[in-house]
Design a protein with these regions (language model features):
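Short, hinge-like loop/turn segments at secondary-structure boundaries
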Residues: 50-54, 94-96, 121-122
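Short secondary-structure boundary segments
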Residues: 37-38, 106-108, 137
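Small/aliphatic-rich secondary-structure junction motif
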Residues: 3-51, 69-77
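Structural beta-alpha unit
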Residues: 69-103
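Glycine-rich, Arg-bearing micro-motifs that act as flexible, cationic patches
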Residues: 102-127
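Residue-level detector of structured alpha->beta connecting loops
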Residues: 30, 99-101, 130
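Short, acidic/small-residue loops that bind anionic groups at enzyme active sites
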Residues: 128-137
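Acidic, proline/glycine-rich short linear motifs
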Residues: 36-63, 86, 90
Length: 137
């Protein structure tokens, strides 16, 4: 059913909850999980400032990949570096380029505010994705 599943992670508690869900779907349907973490950077006054280091990002992805492999999932990891605010576009572009059938991601808990039901990245992905999106909270 899902030959490729894109698991977008950011290291938060909310995204951690999506990891076992993606692993279960991979094992159940025999699909590959692509673990993606997007590193943002900002250019300010001529300086290029990373929100996190490349090593921190790689460590995050490698940890999730190990966890999913240990649970029997077929998995690989990707780290992308984009300009601040471009994370949704990077996720959607990779999903398209890889022929992903499902995007899995976490979000913060629900609130009473209509547009704030999901984190802004999850909100944009849900509304712009061309494939199903499973949001785990």
């Amino acid at each position: 059913m899902f030959e490729r599943i894109l698991l977008a992670v950011d290291g938060s508690e909310h995204s951690r909850k999506a990891v076992p869900v993606a692993g279960d779907l991979s094992r159940r349907y025999g699909g590959e999980v692509i673990v993606l973490h997007v590193r943002e950077h900002e250019v300010t006054w001529g300086a290029d400032i990373d929100v996190e280091t490349a090593d921190e990002a790689r460590e995050l992805v490698d940890g999730v990949v190990r966890e999913l492999k240990d649970s029997g999932a077929n998995v690989r990891g990707e780290v992308m570096r984009v300009a601040l605010g471009q994370t949704p576009r990077a996720i959607l572009d990779l999903a398209r380029d890889e022929g992903v059938g499902l995007i899995v991601m976490g979000t913060r808990g629900l609130s009473d505010w209509g547009r704030l039901l999901m984190g802004s990245v999850a909100h944009k992905i849900v509304h712009l994705a061309e494939v199903p999106v499973l949001v785990v909270r």
